[in-house]
């Protein structure tokens, strides 16, 4: 039976790059793996075919020969780049073809790395940590230095992070020679498993540290001084490199990320770098106009001139009285929104004065009222017609 085209076998085009060829083989290898095809009697042959195709196409010289001569390149001793394979046969060494994707492939099946992973697992980077920090709006405005206590894992001082009693260096695992994985031949397939002796670490500790039980780190609360810049807002993230969890067995530490939450303020509402403040004013002040004092976020006072006849909702701006920009570039503004307050709990004299005021008011005294009821009258007249 004639052989299928190698590119077709891997599901890639003839112009595929080396990376695309590798991805194609990895996909096929996962599809045809025996753990997933126990009921498919053809899976082994198809897997062998994919391995043979990848063995050729991953090698630039052998790929060039195949592109020029096809399968004939490896018949009758052709295919000069065969390098030690009898007759230049492309499928002679399963392990060599598979080794460069073994880590990724079996990591999916067994939850770990491949045969070279053990060396990396000896020293593992510590996890990144998150710390939520709640600030007042005043603190966010001014910035501050704040001391926080972070529960984390720190390097064990008893063993200097090695996990071994007295700080002794771990020894290489004799079973896997430090690789963290062992290989077993199962018929046609070579399967990698986590080393049972060292549990995939590639190392052994004869006398584990009694303080950290061989982990090289211990749980502890750390006190850190953090610089919070002026202008932070809810969602701002501050990264402290190397202040996260300590690494395993001498590995580098992770990072600490501080997430800022700014509490709501009783007077000010923030919108970007601008602040809004709703200020109640008396009916008389709104009608007659005049100056009022308003609070500012820095603890000071701002002076605002209210025009005569101001209505609720009118806004006035105090420039430069908002929040500082986090990365420089000036300061926001503060917007004053007037809320005209209708008087309550009136004395008899006050009621008398208001009645007199209403009686002597002219049509143009309350233009909005006049305009509204004029529209209402037109509406009713239209309904009658």
From Swiss-Prot:
Gene Ontology biological process terms from the UniProt entry: chaperone cofactor-dependent protein refolding; DNA replication; protein refolding; response to heat
Give binding positions for Zn(2+) 2: 173, 176, 195, 198
| Sequence ranges of the CXXCXGXG motif repeats | 156-163, 173-180, 195-202, 209-216
Per its UniProt record, what Gene3D superfamilies does this chain match? DnaJ domain, Heat shock protein DnaJ, cysteine-rich domain, Urease metallochaperone UreE, N-terminal domain
**Cellular localization per UniProt:** Cytoplasm
The alphabetical list of record keywords is:
Chaperone, Cytoplasm, DNA replication, Metal-binding, Repeat, Stress response, Zinc, Zinc-finger
Start and end of every J domain? 5-70
Q: Which InterPro entries match?
A: DnaJ, DnaJ_C, DnaJ_domain, DnaJ_domain_CS, HSP40/DnaJ_pept-bd, HSP_DnaJ_Cys-rich_dom, HSP_DnaJ_Cys-rich_dom_sf, J_dom_sf
Q: Which GO terms describe its molecular function?
A: ATP binding; heat shock protein binding; unfolded protein binding; zinc ion binding
Query: Which positions are annotated as binding Zn(2+) 1?
Result: 156, 159, 209, 212
Cofactor details (free text) = Binds 2 Zn(2+) ions per monomer.
- Needed cofactors: Zn(2+)
A cellular component term (GO) from this record? Answer: cytoplasm
Zinc finger (CR-type) in chain: 143-221
Fill in the domain comment.
The J domain is necessary and sufficient to stimulate DnaK ATPase activity. Zinc center 1 plays an important role in the autonomous, DnaK-independent chaperone activity of DnaJ. Zinc center 2 is essential for interaction with DnaK and for DnaJ activity.
The text of the family note is: Belongs to the DnaJ family.
Fill in the subunit field for this protein.
Homodimer.
Q: What does this protein do?
A: Participates actively in the response to hyperosmotic and heat shock by preventing the aggregation of stress-denatured proteins and by disaggregating proteins, also in an autonomous, DnaK-independent fashion. Unfolded proteins bind initially to DnaJ; upon interaction with the DnaJ-bound protein, DnaK hydrolyzes its bound ATP, resulting in the formation of a stable complex. GrpE releases ADP from DnaK; ATP binding to DnaK triggers the release of the substrate protein, thus completing the reaction cycle.
**Under which name does UniProt file this protein?**
Chaperone protein DnaJ
């Amino acid at each position: 039976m004639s052989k299928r085209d190698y590119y077709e076998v891997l599901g890639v085009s003839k112009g595929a790059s080396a990376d695309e060829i590798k991805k194609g083989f990895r996909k096929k290898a996962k599809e045809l793996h025996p753990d997933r095809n126990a009921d498919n009697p053809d899976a082994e042959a198809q897997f062998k075919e994919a391995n043979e195709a990848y063995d050729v196409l991953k090698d630039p010289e052998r790929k060039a020969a195949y592109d020029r001569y096809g399968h004939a390149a490896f018949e009758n001793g052709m295919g000069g780049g065969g390098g030690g394979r009898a007759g230049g046969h492309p499928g002679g060494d399963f392990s060599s073809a598979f080794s460069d994707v073994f880590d990724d492939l079996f990591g999916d099946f067994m939850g770990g790395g491949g045969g070279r992973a053990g060396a990396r697992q000896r020293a593992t980077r510590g996890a990144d940590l998150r710390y939520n920090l709640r600030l007042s709006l005043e603190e966010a405005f001014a910035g501050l230095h704040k001391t926080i206590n972070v529960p984390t894992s720190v390097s064990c001082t008893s063993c200097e992070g090695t996990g071994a009693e007295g700080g002794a260096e771990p020894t290489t695992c004799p079973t896997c020679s430090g690789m963290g994985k062992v290989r077993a031949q199962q018929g046609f397939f070579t399967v990698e498993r986590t080393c049972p002796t060292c549990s995939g670490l590639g190392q052994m500790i004869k006398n584990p540290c009694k303080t950290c039980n061989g982990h090289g780190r211990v749980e502890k609360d750390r006190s850190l001084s953090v610089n919070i810049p002026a202008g932070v807002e809810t969602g701002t993230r501050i990264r402290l490199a190397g202040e996260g969890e300590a690494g395993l067995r001498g590995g580098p530490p992770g990072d600490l990320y501080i997430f800022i939450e700014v509490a709501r303020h009783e007077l000010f509402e923030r919108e970007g770098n601008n602040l809004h403040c709703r200020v109640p004013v008396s009916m008389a002040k709104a009608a007659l106009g005049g100056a009022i004092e308003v609070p500012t976020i820095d603890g000071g006072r701002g002076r605002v001139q209210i025009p005569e006849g101001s209505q609720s909702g009118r806004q006035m701006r105090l420039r430069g009285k908002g929040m500082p920009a986090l990365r420089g570039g000036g300061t926001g503004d503060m917007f004053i929104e007037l809320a005209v307050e209708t008087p309550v709990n009136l004395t008899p004299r006050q009621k008398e004065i208001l009645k007199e005021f209403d009686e002597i008011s002219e049509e143009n005294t309350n233009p909005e009222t006049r305009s509204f009821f004029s529209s209402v009258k037109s509406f009713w007249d239209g309904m009658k017609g």
